[in-house]
Amino acid sequence: MQPLQLGLLDGQQLVEFLLLFLVVLNMGIRYLSHRRHQRQAEEGGPDAITRFLALEVSTVVLVLVAFVYMTIHYHGGMIISILAITVLISDFFEFEARKVEARNELPLESPRAAIGASFVLLAYVSYVALFFLVEPFWSAVV
């Protein structure tokens, strides 16, 4: 018998809502991170721009909770994990792009790739977590 053969036994229903909360929290922290990067670029130039620890931590926690969700629902967990990893990778490259923009004295653009990936992740996690709201209508049609 494997340790995770039975999956997560306690709090299975809470993981979906935890994912939804983490995605929304991550998007809010991304907004604060972008404002902080703009302020750092104005005050100290390109060398003053540093990673926002809260964004990094929230993204890693989001990926880890997505992996936990994969032990409960393989298909949905795999999709959410791939999307969360996409957000993590895009955050890494968006930070580097902000530093390049600051070095070239260009205005800092919003992190479009990370925002786009976050909205796709938000749409899927909302579908998974809030499906009970549309289930009666869905069952009538399908």
Regions found by a protein language model. Give the residues of each.
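Short, strongly hydrophobic alpha-helical membrane anchors
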Residues: 1-11, 140-142
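Physicochemical signature of membrane-embedded alpha-helices that form the seven-helix bundle of GPCRs
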Residues: 15-18, 22, 51-54, 58, ...
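N-terminal signal-anchor/start-transfer transmembrane helix
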Residues: 15-36
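Short juxtamembrane and helix-loop transition motifs at transmembrane-helix boundaries
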Residues: 36-50
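Core segments of transmembrane alpha-helices
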Residues: 54-68, 116-128
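Short alpha-helical packing/oligomerization segments
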Residues: 66-96
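Membrane-helix boundary connector in multi-pass membrane proteins
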Residues: 95-113
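Juxtamembrane boundary at the C-terminal end of a transmembrane helix
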Residues: 126-142
